[in-house]
Amino acid sequence: MKPAHTFSLIFSLLFVINPCYSATLPLAIRRELTWGQVNILHTTDIHGWLAGHARDKRYSGDLGDFASFVQHMKHLAKQKDVDLLLVDTGDLHDGTGLSDLTDPPGSWTDSLLANMDYDILVAGNHELYLSTVANDTYHNFIPLWEGRYLAANIDIYDEHVSSFVPFGDRYAIFSTPHNVKILAFGFVNSFSGATDTVRVLPVSQFSLQPWWNDMVSNKDIDLILIPAHVPVHNASELDIVLSELRIHFPTTPIQVLGGHSHIRDYAIYDEKAVGIESGRYCETVGWVSINGIPSFKSLVKLSGISSLMGVESYLAERLRFIGESIRRSSQQIFSSLQSAKSASVSFSRSYIDWNPEGFMFHSKTKKSSFNTSLGEFISNGIYEARKALGLLTPIGCSPKKFAFSEVPFNDSNSIYHLFQSELFPKIVVNESRHHIPHYIIVNSGGIRGGLNSGAFGLDEVFQVCPFKSNIFYVLKDVPWSITKYLPQALQHSGYLIAEDTLQINTPQVSDAKFEDFYEHSIRKTYGYTTHDDLGDDGDDTAHLTTPHYEPLRFICSQVGFDDSFSGDDKQVVDVVAPSFVIPRLDDILNKIADKPLYSPDDWELYFTRPDGKHSMTDLLPLYADLYWDHDCLYK
């Protein structure tokens, strides 16, 4: 199933990569995409990053650049006489000021995304945490897609009918221009923490639902798409769905399009079922192609050689190349084509770095012709929205780069270390109880990105920590006989996954040196070097492997444990945490005590400010204002 790739070298402008690495790249080395009968561009876990990564050339494209790319690729697909679909698999919200500063959060970014020509979309868990976001998505965003926004296991309370109703369509059946009949069936991962107006239904109960029986009764399906907000590996929900579908569609090709764990990944389930996951934060565009679908029909009349890529065109070209094909009759050629149509299905995948240079390379366009009117409209809309939200105005000056995962958790250059050693002890302060030794505990998934050196604004603040609803509570006077075991117990308690923790977001990297891909003398940027079930050749751009260190599961600041603290078991300490972590902490403390001592009702508000700036998101600008120079604001 592993496709043969055509390798290509192209020259690009010299640019400086992320300042963490201080390296330059004189040449961008890119792999060509493999086209098939059905091709899919895939996005996932965008999290509001529609403006792209302006300070990182590897992922510098905005949504407007992507829109232009999609339009050019659709034109290219038409030239090649093949199908091209566009699919997104959820988590459009929570992650940037552009997304999170509007009321309701994500309403402006949803309006911009509505300009995209998506064929299928599904919800992620971040569409479902807040009732305002869920209701806005249900009432104003989902109807725009006319039955192509899928939510097999999500119900929402509709106040107009006073009952729970499907959040989106359970499934969709449609045919492509080339006569491929597709069943698309999408769902979200099982998670806790959804707003009270939303119900996430167990995937294990799908086969008991009336709509499931209606869906699987369609036997003339040529291709099954499973766009789902789940990882493509080690997801029990996906295992259940694949097993159930294979009962009814034992030989139908299945393409899974996953998400949630923020990595590039590809999985092979059986000889006709595969899955791709396409990263996060507008860093990656996934690409899959599928060949060997018998129902596929060329839109160009067969004349010895038809379309540029399909099975018919490939076989016709081979017949022309081989001498004996010249002597074959048209009937023999037709027979050969029919035989090819019954051959086994094949798949390929690529991971495209989200930048204009790569988009131009793959769409065979130039800078002068790349931007489309739609792309420029969206880019202008992003700029105006950022301007209106105050995102273009710097509010602080970072003295250096604080890395997210490129350095160890406790390194002084780590964003986690900054929060643990500086922000929590110095900003999260309750004057009436600050003298009492206390822990400040946050799940590390509450930190979602690093911070570059120099000026930063509200957009960067939300990129580091977008959880505006995370405010701090205290559990008072907990005996040291219990709390002395708490730091160790936290790290052995498992990941707190409901808030989409990023401990599972590691790119699956390899030490492959790509000797067969480029000359050793050519320099590369740091970036994704993905190893998946198809090997090491999926990344469209050759990179050096980015250093990656897993964070601890929880950030735990110990404050006030000075020489006066004796460590006697009868001493008491306070435990401070945001509301999201409280149920986990209660569970851990009760297990240490071996009895049910604590519940959420025992926690009291700890850190408040008259100006309302007391959430996790507010800590960074508050700290910067007090402890960092402001010189960059006046340059």
Curated annotation (Swiss-Prot):
* Site-annotated residues for Transition state stabilizer: H126
Entry's Gene Ontology molecular function annotations: 5'-nucleotidase activity; metal ion binding
Record flagged with keyword Zinc: yes
Please indicate if the UniProt record lists Metal-binding as a keyword: yes
Chief location of this protein?
cytoplasm
Annotated residues that bind substrate are located at: F467
Query: What keywords are assigned to this protein?
Result: Cytoplasm, Hydrolase, Metal-binding, Zinc
Cellular component terms per the entry's GO annotation: cytosol; extracellular region
For this UniProt entry, which residues form the secretion signal? none
Kindly state a single biological-process term from the GO annotations of this entry.
nucleobase-containing compound catabolic process
InterPro entries, per this entry?
A: 5'-Nucleotdase_C_sf (IPR036907), 5_nucleotidase/apyrase (IPR006179), Calcineurin-like_PHP_ApaH (IPR004843), Metallo-depent_PP-like (IPR029052), Nucleosidase_C (IPR053828), Pesterase_C1039 (IPR014485), YHR202W_N (IPR041823)
Task: Enumerate the residues binding Zn(2+) 1.
Answer: D45, H47, D91
Q: Which cofactor does it need?
A: Zn(2+)
Binding of Zn(2+) 2 occurs at D91, N125, H260
Location in the cell reads: Cytoplasm
Q: Which Pfam family is an annotated match for this chain, by its short name?
A: Metallophos
Q: Which family does it belong to?
A: Belongs to the 5'-nucleotidase family.
Q: What is the name attached to this protein's record?
A: Uncharacterized protein C17G6.03
Could you tell me which species this protein originates from? Schizosaccharomyces pombe (strain 972 / ATCC 24843)
